[in-house]
């Protein structure tokens, strides 16, 4: 049995694509998963299962959400080992930064630096980003809402052919904790 986090993209934002967390928990239960929990209202669920892999579990959940709620949702599923490594490998001094300054964008596939070669990173300072394993770490000292770099990273050219969803550092750390094996 493996514990996973499901990351849903773009739900419950600005009153659009509403998906109550109680309904998401119930849906995961009906799919046969155990230990189902949600974190916040922005589309994080934790569950345990003994079947499937990250990609098949994400596809199953995305189809079930569309069937049940009538709208498509991009879903990424990641296990504890991956989530813990994202925390461990952070290239920025996470302990020194406010959670609103540090974000991780999770990707459905590996990303290479050439995808972002068109960005003038010097012009976007003091904001910075670094690539990780199927993720991108973003340091935005004034927060994500005011970040010119976040806007540039999210443009279609930069996100082409990928499912991508971002979380602030507090959520990144919490998901690693919630998926950890029980002692």
Task: Tell where the protein language model's regions lie, with residue ranges.
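Surface-exposed, charge/polar-rich loops and edge strands
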Residues: 2-183
């Amino acid at each position: 049995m493996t514990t996973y986090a499901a990351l849903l993209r773009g739900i419950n934002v600005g009153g659009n694509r509403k998906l109550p967390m109680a309904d998401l928990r119930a849906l995961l239960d009906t799919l046969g998963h155990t230990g189902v929990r949600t974190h916040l209202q922005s589309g994080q669920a934790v569950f345990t299962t003994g079947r499937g892999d990250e990609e098949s579990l994400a596809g199953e959940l995305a189809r079930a959400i569309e069937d049940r709620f009538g709208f498509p949702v991009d879903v990424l599923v990641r296990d504890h080992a991956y989530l813990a490594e994202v925390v461990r490998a952070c290239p920025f001094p996470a302990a020194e930064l406010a959670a609103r300054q540090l974000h991780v964008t999770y990707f459905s596939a590996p990303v290479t630096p050439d995808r972002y070669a068109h960005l003038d990173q010097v012009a976007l300072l003091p904001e910075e980003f670094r690539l990780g394993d199927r993720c991108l770490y973003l340091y935005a000292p004034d927060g994500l809402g005011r970040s010119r770099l976040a806007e540039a990273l999210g443009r279609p050219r930069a996100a082409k052919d990928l499912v991508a969803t971002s979380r602030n550092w507090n959520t990144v750390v919490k998901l690693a904790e919630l998926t950890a094996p029980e002692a």
